[in-house]
Amino acid sequence: MTTVPPTRDTAAIRIWLSIVAGLIALMVLVGGATRLTESGLSIVEWKPVTGTLPPLSEQAWSDAFEAYKTIPQYRQMNAGMTLHEFKTIFWWEWAHRLLGRVIGMVYLLPFLWFLWRGAVSGPLGRRLWLIFGLGALQGAVGWWMVASGLTERTEVAPVRLATHLSLALLIFASIVWTLRRLKPRDEAEVPGRLRLTAWALVGVTFVQLYLGALVAGLRAGLVYNTWPEIDGGLIPAAANLWAHAPWWINLFENHLTVQFMHRMTAYTLLALAAWHAFDVMRAGAGRDAVRGAHRLLAAILVQAVLGIATLLMVVPISLALLHQGTALIVLTFAVLQAERLSPRRVAAVAVPQAAVAAGQAG
């Protein structure tokens, strides 16, 4: 065993981080709904403190609506929208921003408490400070994303949307990793190739989630709604894949290219997960590793089916959100498997010396 027995602080930290991870997952889903309902530009100002409260009077609602009318999205897409219709999209964006504020407080206040108690130090302390820094950065990235749709565009820039989501998922994955590190386990002796494929699965999952965000940002799921064919074949014509100049712009703005990359990465992820599950069993890596590999493979299979159904049904909101939620499960299982197969060399949490002694005696 490479970690000391859990202490009261360890259990409290795990509960705290589990709540934060759950809130982040909820925020990702609310963010997805905000995008799918085209609500993300309904609040055109960034007021971190005073923006916590929604409009509380008819005049305040009228002012918020008039501010929305000044941006291109209203003029080009929603001209004639009623105040009642505006309120519908406003509440999605307001809820998304409110969740961000709540997550900030739920993370910061207990973190300060644990710091005051001396319960976090060393690798754990550094990791928690890093997560805090990423969370602060995420707020700035969120406004950077929204600002891209307030001048000439009628929606936020897809690359900025994908960056915003990817940073949220990085924070989520970091918390999942930390939670797993705080749970004692036996050190497993496994071949290095298993660790390599486990980490490759994490990397490919992140790439796939980024591409999925690009698909959503471009509304690329509303076109090429056939499977397994795309644009008339299994592989689109090169002239269509690279239709824009310079060539690299197709990787971010060509609907066909982005959707094709999303499909190909899904196939790659599924094949890699299947190979990893087989290799873990062949190597005799232990029951936990085998179960983890099988859970990950099953989640990816479900996610693939949901993705195909979402495409064929032309992106119904409920199915698209289920697809996004399952992506979080895939990421969770991938991170857990990578941690499960990674060595632990030091204790993950600061504990009293008495606990260390008790662990050694046991």
Swiss-Prot record:
It comes from the Bacteria. GO terms for molecular function: metal ion binding; oxidoreductase activity, acting on NAD(P)H, heme protein as acceptor. Pathway: Porphyrin-containing compound metabolism; heme A biosynthesis; heme A from heme O: step 1/1. Its cofactor is heme b. It is a multi-pass membrane protein. Its EC number is 1.17.99.9. Pfam families: COX15-CtaA (PF02628). Interacts with CtaB. This is Heme A synthase. It comes from Bradyrhizobium sp. (strain ORS 278). The gene is ctaA.
